[in-house]
Structures are given as C-alpha cells and as structure tokens.
UniProtKB/Swiss-Prot annotation:
<keyword id="KW-1133">Transmembrane helix</keyword>
<feature type="transmembrane region" description="Helical">
    <location>
        <begin position="33"/>
        <end position="53"/>
    </location>
</feature>
<keyword id="KW-0812">Transmembrane</keyword>
<dbReference type="Pfam" id="PF02694">
    <property type="entry name" value="UPF0060"/>
</dbReference>
<dbReference type="InterPro" id="IPR003844">
    <property type="entry name" value="UPF0060"/>
</dbReference>
<keyword id="KW-1003">Cell membrane</keyword>
<dbReference type="GO" id="GO:0005886">
    <property type="term" value="C:plasma membrane"/>
</dbReference>
<feature type="transmembrane region" description="Helical">
    <location>
        <begin position="91"/>
        <end position="111"/>
    </location>
</feature>
<keyword id="KW-0472">Membrane</keyword>
<protein>
    <recommendedName>
        <fullName>UPF0060 membrane protein AAur_4166</fullName>
    </recommendedName>
</protein>
<feature type="transmembrane region" description="Helical">
    <location>
        <begin position="8"/>
        <end position="28"/>
    </location>
</feature>
<comment type="similarity">
    <text>Belongs to the UPF0060 family.</text>
</comment>
<feature type="transmembrane region" description="Helical">
    <location>
        <begin position="62"/>
        <end position="82"/>
    </location>
</feature>
Length: 112
C-alpha cells in the first residue's frame, strides 16, 4: 500500500507542479492571458500539499526522490503538450532518475 500511495502522490505532485509551471510558461513566453499564470500559481501551491502527504516523514528524502519524478514527468509533459520528442539520452537519463527514485524511497533501511 505504501508503494501505491507514494506513486500516486508523486504522479499527482508532478501533474500539479509541471502543469503549474507550464501554465506560467504559456502566459509569459507564449502570450496566453495572464490568468493562465494565476492558475499556474494555484497549481504550484497544490503541488506542495501532495508532497506533504507522502508517507515518508523526511522532507529531504521525499523532495530528492521527487526530483527524479519531475525529470521524467517533464519529458512526458513536453511530449503530450508541446510535441517534444526526447532523444535516447533524454530517455536514458530519465530512466536512471526513476531507478534513483526507487532506491531513495523504497530501499530497506534499519528500523523499518
């Protein structure tokens, strides 16, 4: 259950953070209405709550592991929303990061 909860929260956090940053990007760089940026700020705030709901009690561990999710998620978002096509090095790098997420979050530790 912990792996499932952690995974779901990381996915929700990625959608909120990457989506929020993308909305701000659209307003600032692509000429969309400024209310897009406002929605982006709200989404970024929501991201913080998803991170705080992680079952692991250590902020540094959660945010370090989330960094790997952010990297892979950003490439995926770019593919879906902007037509970005990652090259093999992008994919290899993202895969390495996801392995790192697993090690950081789920490696057996003394004391449980």
């Amino acid at each position: 259950m912990t792996i499932l909860k952690t995974t779901i929260l990381f996915v929700l956090a990625a959608v909120a953070e990457i989506g929020g940053a993308w909305l701000i990007w659209q307003a600032v760089r692509e000429g969309k209405a400024w209310w897009w940026a406002g929605l982006g700020v709200v989404a970024l705030g929501i991201y913080g709550f998803f991170a705080a709901f992680q079952p692991d009690a250590h902020f540094g561990r959660v945010l370090a592991a989330y960094g790997g999710v952010f990297i892979a998620g950003s490439l995926g978002w770019g593919m879906l929303m902007d037509g970005f096509r990652p090259d093999r090095w992008d994919v290899i790098g993202a895969a390495i990061c996801i392995v790192g997420v697993g090690v950081i979050m789920f490696a057996p530790r003394p004391g449980g």
